[in-house]
């Protein structure tokens, strides 16, 4: 992978639409986010591609080099450009008036006056970002990129009105070599580390898209997405043998789902409810278990609703993790010439990167963990529209200690809570919280518990389809669905013995397929059940 520092110097005002919400005093604002104005990587990459397209058409050759650099339909190119931000403090936006043109006559339309807020000209404004290549560029590719850089002198909208005059500079950034085996803190035995990944760019973590022109984003990072990003990073770095070490064999490295906000963040258990008027959440897992184990019944609280999203342990207790989202507008590309297609707009919901951290648990052998850390150190790119400046994650830290107490301590706290409700033999019970999808049906789930002499005595779970193939192939729901993260299963040992060993085995092994991608992961007696337990006698 090669990195370039890219600097864009405007010589006139800039207006890049479709990214920022319009100000109350204008019809449209140039691209900006919660921090500052910016140049989206997609806008700059589109301008470079347009210049390169003119060059290869004029020369009559080089179309293959153009495709390798900028990509084509369903194939990602070698170049990606992140958002560019001002180097110095930028002045306030200035208001600029313009009229709309009639498409038929190309004349000014009557009574169609617009006001846009654009960057101020003449203040020495500069934008800086990073251009990366997924592989070393050939001599022809470097020549085409350099020629396109020199030819690109306009950017954004209103170029026919004198806006968007720019100059672009590129400077290669040296990448320090990685010394394998020099990572401290990783045990010599198989274990688990937690990668702390900070978002450097907006994220579009898509779900199965509906038929509309709006693509929404979920609020957490799949283990499969991180696993794929690690594989792509190892390939960029040229460590092809490491792919088999990390991802192949009988015991590949396992990547868990990453929730934002805090190291303790987990998907909201389906037993967790929050007051409609606001306040601390309440969890029903202990009460449900006590009722099933012969304890005192607890009536249902009123004025509560099911909690959703991710929850993390804050100083004042368990709180919902809030992330900032925004909608951006994008245009589809014409496959013939690569230019924006007329009338084909779509909206993307993205997650703002500022202050956003993901904590990714990775389990494997020491050699696997070292390769994973090396790949993460070269930046990971996840989610959709990565080539348009979305999805870059930077490794901030590697944690080797679990945020959870030992299972023995968690199980003892669970027992102590059940005793307050007069539950019979509380040591034989436990709760299993799914922190990843569980891809088994009800019968296979019960058999998995039976192998450890456990039986399901209660639970709150939900199943959902996990792919677009279900509708296309008309698969039965029990085949193409899974238990969603947050499903809670309350179990009891069938022989009247302590459930501690059985819970430990399930927590270590998981249930069902897909463990390398974060599927099948469960946590026994999670602290959120006890911390949010509120006794209610009705």
Give residue ranges: language-model regions:
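Conserved active-site/ligand-binding neighborhood in enzyme cores
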Residues: 1-538
């Amino acid at each position: 992978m090669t990195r370039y520092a890219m600097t864009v110097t405007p010589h006139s005002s800039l207006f890049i639409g479709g990214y920022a919400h319009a100000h109350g005093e204008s019809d449209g604002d140039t691209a900006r986010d919660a921090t500052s104005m910016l140049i989206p990587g997609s806008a700059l990459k589109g301008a470079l591609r347009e210049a390169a397209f003119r060059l290869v058409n004029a020369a009559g050759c080089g179309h293959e080099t153009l495709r390798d650099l900028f990509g084509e339909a369903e194939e990602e190119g070698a170049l990606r450009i992140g958002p560019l931000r001002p180097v110095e403090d930028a002045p306030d936006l200035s208001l600029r008036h313009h009229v709309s043109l009639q498409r038929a006559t190309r004349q000014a339309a009557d009574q169609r006056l617009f006001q846009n807020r654009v960057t101020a000209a003449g203040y020495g404004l500069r934008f800086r970002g990073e251009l990366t290549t997924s592989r070393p560029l050939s001599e022809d590719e470097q020549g085409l990129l350099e020629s396109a850089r020199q030819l690109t002198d306009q950017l954004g909208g209103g170029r026919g009105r004198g806006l968007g005059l720019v100059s672009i500079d590129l400077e290669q950034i040296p990448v320090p070599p990685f010394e394998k085996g020099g990572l401290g803190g990783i045990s010599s035995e198989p274990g688990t580390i937690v990668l702390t990944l900070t978002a450097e760019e907006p994220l579009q973590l898509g779900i199965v898209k509906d038929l509309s022109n709006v693509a929404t984003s979920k609020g957490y990072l799949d283990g499969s997405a991180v696993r794929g990003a690690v594989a792509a990073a190892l390939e960029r770095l040229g460590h092809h043998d490491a792919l088999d070490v990390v991802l192949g064999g009988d015991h590949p490295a396992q990547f868990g789902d990453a929730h934002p906000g805090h190291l303790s963040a987990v998907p909201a258990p389906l037993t967790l409810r929050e007051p409609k008027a606001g306040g601390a959440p309440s969890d029903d897992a202990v009460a449900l278990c006590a009722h099933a184990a012969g304890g005192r019944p607890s009536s249902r609280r009123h004025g509560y609703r099911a909690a959703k999203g991710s929850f993390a342990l804050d100083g004042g207790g368990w709180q919902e993790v809030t992330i900032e989202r925004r909608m951006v507008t994008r245009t589809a590309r014409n496959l013939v010439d690569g230019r924006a297609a007329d009338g084909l707009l779509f909206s993307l919901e993205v997650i703002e990167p500022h202050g956003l951290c993901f904590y990714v648990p990775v389990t494997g052998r020491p050699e696997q963990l070292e390769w994973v850390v090396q790949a993460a150190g070269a930046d990971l790119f996840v989610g959709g529209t990565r080539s348009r400046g979305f999805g870059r994650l930077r490794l901030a830290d590697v944690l080797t200690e679990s945020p959870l107490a030992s299972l023995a301590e968690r199980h003892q706290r669970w027992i102590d809570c059940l005793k307050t409700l007069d539950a019979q033999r509380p040591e034989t019970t436990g709760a299993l919280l799914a922190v990843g999808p569980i891809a088994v049906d009800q019968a296979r789930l019960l058999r998995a518990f039976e192998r450890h002499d456990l039986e399901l005595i209660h639970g709150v779970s939900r199943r959902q389809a996990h792919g677009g193939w279900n509708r296309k192939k008309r698969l039965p729901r029990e085949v193409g669905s899974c238990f969603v993260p947050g499903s809670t299963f309350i179990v009891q040992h069938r022989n009247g013995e302590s459930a501690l060993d059985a819970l430990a085995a399930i927590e270590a092994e998981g249930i069902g397929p897909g463990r390398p991608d974060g599927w099948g992961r469960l946590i026994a007696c999670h602290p959120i059940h006890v911390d949010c337990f509120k006794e209610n006698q009705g």
